[in-house]
């Protein structure tokens, strides 16, 4: 018996919608990363993108434990000398709440072309509305 390897053209991808209201950021992000990679499927193959599309709603209502709401800091560098910038979790939620979930999930995906392809299947929205009704997403309870 030969080992089954998924082919990119035969992978069936489903669309799911997740409500992030009250969900803990890290626990939500790990499950999203797992499903974007396709590890929940029997035909999972490490070098093939077998994951599903995921729509996350209410990103502005995601929860963090402890004092992370005030203490957690996101850093990025502009590329110029002395150009390190920092933004707290509260400021990030106020400015761009989608980015909080995107950063958490992106760090859990593989680095490289395959990981970028997986990340493109994640759609995050701050509010309760999305424009993917034509794909008929199923509700996923995490």
Swiss-Prot record:
InterPro entries (alphabetical): Ribosomal_uL13 (IPR005822), Ribosomal_uL13_bac-type (IPR005823), Ribosomal_uL13_CS (IPR023563), Ribosomal_uL13_sf (IPR036899)
Family to which this protein belongs: Belongs to the universal ribosomal protein uL13 family.
Protein's organism: Shigella sonnei (strain Ss046)
PANTHER family the UniProt entry points to: LARGE RIBOSOMAL SUBUNIT PROTEIN UL13M, RIBOSOMAL PROTEIN L13
GO MF entries: mRNA binding; structural constituent of ribosome
Protein keywords: Ribonucleoprotein, Ribosomal protein
Residue intervals passing through the bilayer: none
Lineage start: Bacteria, Pseudomonadati, Pseudomonadota, Gammaproteobacteria, Enterobacterales
Oligomer status and interactors: Part of the 50S ribosomal subunit.
Protein name: Large ribosomal subunit protein uL13
Pfam families registered for this protein in UniProt: Ribosomal_L13
Gene3D superfamilies, per the entry: Ribosomal protein L13 (3.90.1180.10)
Record GO biological process: negative regulation of translation; translation
GO cellular component: cytosolic large ribosomal subunit
Domain of life: Bacteria
Function recorded in the entry: This protein is one of the early assembly proteins of the 50S ribosomal subunit, although it is not seen to bind rRNA by itself. It is important during the early stages of 50S assembly.
């Amino acid at each position: 018996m030969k080992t089954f390897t998924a082919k990119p053209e035969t992978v069936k991808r489903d669309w799911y919608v997740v409500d992030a209201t009250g969900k803990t950021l890290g626990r939500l992000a790990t499950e999203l990363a797992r499903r974007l990679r396709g590890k929940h499927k029997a035909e999972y193959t490490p070098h093939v993108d077998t994951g599903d599309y995921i729509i996350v709603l209410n990103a502005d209502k995601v929860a963090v434990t402890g004092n992370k709401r005030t203490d957690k800091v996101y850093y990025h560098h502009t590329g110029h000398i002395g150009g390190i910038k920092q933004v707290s979790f509260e400021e990030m939620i106020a400015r761009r709440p989608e980015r909080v979930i995107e950063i958490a999930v992106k760090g859990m995906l593989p680095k490289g072309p395959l990981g970028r392809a997986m990340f493109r299947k994640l759609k995050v929205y701050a509010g309760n509305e999305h424009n993917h009704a034509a794909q008929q997403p199923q509700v996923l309870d995490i």
